[in-house]
Amino acid sequence: KFRKTKRLVSARVISSYIPPRWSQIRLSGARVAEAIRAKVIPVTESSPVSALSSLEEEDLLVPTQRFQMSKLLKNPAIFGYLLLAIITLIQSRNRFGALNGGALAASPSGARDLWGFYFESWHQVGMGSSHASPAWIAVLAMASTLLLGKAPLLVTVFFLAAPVLIMWSGHTFLRKLSSNQFITIPASFLYALSPVALTSVNSGRLATLVALMIAPQIPIILSNWKQVELNSWRRIYGLCILLAVLTSFTLITTLVCLGVIGYAIVTDYDEKLAKPLFLARIYKRLTLLIFPFILVAPYSFEALVRPARFFAEPGLNLAGGTAALVLSGNPGGAGSLPWWTISPILLLLIIALFSSSNARSFAQVGISFMCAAVLFSSISITVHGNSSGTRTWVGTLLVGATLASVAAGVVILDRLRTVLIASNIHYRHILAGLLLIVTAMYSVSSIGWSITAGADSPVQSNMKGVMPAFLTAEADTKTLVLREVGSANSKSIQYYISRGEDISLGEPDVASGQVRAIEIAAQELIDGSGISSSQVFSAYGIKYIFVKNPFSRNVIRTIDGLGGFART
């Protein structure tokens, strides 16, 4: 309004001097491409040479400068990203195609199916469900629209590019702590190959991968958390949108924000701040807590009635690791690193806790996340239609511990060399050597495992479906599916109700709990006491019982011996 009242020339006169919108977009694209080219292949500026000096005979003998690959690879950023891309391609050799397996369900054919599933009020999952669809379905639908609606292509590209994107996001944060690329690039490289990152890719954990990418951007956007009133409302709302995207994938983000913001409010209250300053801080902090939770409604509101959803992640509910494994920074579960690949995360946090630099603050945050992860890993939850409890997956909490550990390591190493040179040999030299040895051993062991045995992960491409073709021919026909899961030493039998096709993205998240009568009938069918199981199944419209090979022959003979069932 102020410029409108003070302008001297009308907008019609000015518009003739402004280039068209398409020209501006094309010029911006050219500038971005030129900036990337100059960053990757820097050009040395040469001073202008006169025509007389250029014709001198001795200048003709000077060789011209040529592009050398060795100079390019000496750039730590280019070498780090290139090495990570090569490792990712080798360990992803079984993931070129439509992905499923682990916690990742099969992708629908296109974005239209995702949009339809998101807006449906009744879902044909199991016995039927009226639960609200999670907001991450809409996020995937919008992203797949950019790829011409190819949802399977989006999921494949996301898992292939995830390690590089995680490294880039971590590097953008770590370079704020140190200008030495020989420290920040290896640190971001290890962040992308951390146990939680490798396990998330192998087991199909969408939410944890998104958290690994978004977490480093949060302290960049909100650089001054203690004096939050200095941040503009535009920055606050921008962070709200970023937190809403993360909350749409996992509601544990709300619990983390509740703990962090609650602690900050109590600290401000103890400092006895002036009332205007205290209110200015509390308004912006509560905005970061409430707005992301509202933006992912109504799925978030249903979690208030079913608190177990705060600990659930997208996809099938697979068990996480034990508390001892989580304490080492490894979330455990299917596709996780073996126990002998010891991560330096806990050692870094302990060393940084006794540091006199800013590394101590990062260590305090990291240990808080680590303690929360160990606590919740001992809890079993019942979500996504499961009738039995499953050990909680705490990968999202370990993201905070991993990022804090890497940041503390960067702060320590940035000033470690000068401190060690200026001091005599004492415990700092021993701890530094021990840390470097553990980090090197983890790097070699994790990379070696990921490109060999780790490539045969639960998430693979073009995996065979569970349901055979003759059962998928009848649409919406209810089928009780029995299959064995687990290792050769400890096997268990799982069952679920199918609607004529394999479960797809989003369906496990809206699945309702099993009907108690069907649950009892299925258990009696397996143990051989289900004389009336066929009557219960027919009463609920279950037409077929499908046993997925390999399966115990004794259980199959038991089912054949019961009345009311006929082989087809």
Language model features by range: what are they?
Residues 470-540:
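Extracytoplasmic/lumenal acceptor-recognition loop(s) of multi-pass membrane glycoenzymes
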Residues 226-245, 283:
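Short hydrophobic alpha-helices at membrane interfaces in multi-pass membrane enzymes
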Residues 416-446:
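Signature aromatic-anchored transmembrane alpha helix within multi-pass, membrane-resident enzymes
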Residues 37, 41-48, 53, 117-123, ...:
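Periplasmic/ER-lumenal interhelical loops and adjacent helix-loop junctions
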Residues 29, 47-92:
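Start-transfer (signal-anchor) and selected internal transmembrane alpha helices
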Residues 89-216, 221, 225, 229-231:
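Active-site lumenal/periplasmic loops and adjacent helix-entry segments of GT-C-fold
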Residues 103-110, 197-209, 315-331, 365-428:
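Membrane-helix boundary/interfacial segments in multi-pass membrane proteins
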Residues 224, 256-290:
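Perimembrane helix-loop-helix junctions
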